[in-house]
Amino acid sequence: MSLTRLNIEAFRNIQSAQLIPAPGINLIYGQNGSGKTSILEAIYFLGMGRSFRSHLSQRVINNDDDKLTLFATLNLARGDSKIGLRRFRSGETEVRIDGEKVKRLSTLAETLPIQVITPESFSLLFEGPKSRRQFIDWGAFHADPLFYGAWTNVRRVLKQRNQLLRNGSSYSNIQFWDQEFVRYAEQVTEIRNHYVDSLNELLKGIIGEFLPSVDVKVSFTRGWDSKTDFAELLENQYSRDLATGHTVSGPHKADLRLRVGTLPAQDALSRGQLKLLVCALRIAQGKLLKQQIDKHSIYLVDDLPSELDAQHRQLLLKQLTDTGAQVFVTAIDPAAIVDSLHTPPSRMFHVEQGRVTVIE
C-alpha cells in the first residue's frame, strides 16, 4: 500500500499543494517553518481525522480559510482507492472513501494505517500508560475485527458505571453494569494480550539490531491482578470506587511495561537509547501489521537528523527500507538523509513558505 497522489488545501501554511509520492523513501526538506512537517501532519490527519501536533484540529486550518481539504489516491492490492477529508472551522468533518460518505473516523484508520516517528512520539515511554495503551490498541484494532466493538462497549459501560459511582448508587444498581463491564473487559484484554505476544516475537530481533547490548523485557499488564476474578474484584472494590468516584481497576488501566533487568526502561536507558527503543516498537508494529493482514503501514518520520546520530540514522533508514513500506521523512539538510541511505531516495520534495517543489 502506498500514496500515489496527495492534495493539500488550506492546511496550516500550505495554501495549495499537490504531491505525487513514490513507493519507498520520500524525502521532504526545507527550513524550519517552511511547511515540511505540515505535509506529514496532513497525511496523518487524512488517516486519523486529527493532528499529531494539536488537540484543537481547527488550528490546522489556514487563517484565510473556513475549511481545509485533503485528498489522496491509495494504491492497494485490490486497486486504487480515493480518500477525501474536509474539516470546517466549526468542527464539522466530512469524509469520503471512493465517493461514499463515511460516518466513523475509525474507517479512515482502517483504510490508511500510519506509523509516526516524531519528537513528540517519544512520549510513548516518558508519559503515563495512556499513550502505551493507545499503541497496543492501534495494533489490536487492525489485527482483530472484534476489538473495536468490544473497546467501544468498554468505554460506554465504564462511563455509565463511573456516573453511578459519582451519584452514590448502591452496588445492586451497579451490578448489571458490572456484568457487562466484565464481559467486554475480558474480550478486550484477551485481544490485547494476544497482540502483545505476537509483537514480542518480532520486537526481540529489531531491538537486537538497535540495542545489541541491552536486554529489554516487554510485558502486558491488564489493569488488574491476572490471578483475581474481575467480577469479584469489582464487587470487593465497590466501596473504594464509591469513595473515589471512579473505577480504580480495569482495562482502562492496562499498560505496556518495558524493563531492563529490574528497572523500568525509562530509568535504565539513556534518552538516545529510549528513542531507538521507540523506533523499534514502531517498526515492529508495522511489520506485524503486514504479517497479520498483508497491509503496509505508511511511516511518517519528522526531523530525523536532530533526533538520532549518523550511525543510528543509517540503521533506522535501513530498517524502514527493508519493511517495503512507503516512508515520508523530513530534514532541514537533505544530505543528512541522503548520506544515510544505501540508495538515493525514491523522490525528493523541497518546501519553502508552504510551496512544494519536486526535485528531479
Swiss-Prot record:
Any one annotated GO CC term: cytoplasm
GO biological process, one term: SOS response
Molecular function in Gene Ontology: ATP binding; single-stranded DNA binding
Pfam families: SMC_N
Annotated compartments: Cytoplasm
Binding site residues for ATP: G30, Q31, N32, G33, S34, G35, K36, T37
Protein name per the record: DNA replication and repair protein RecF
Organism: Shewanella baltica (strain OS185)
Gene: recF
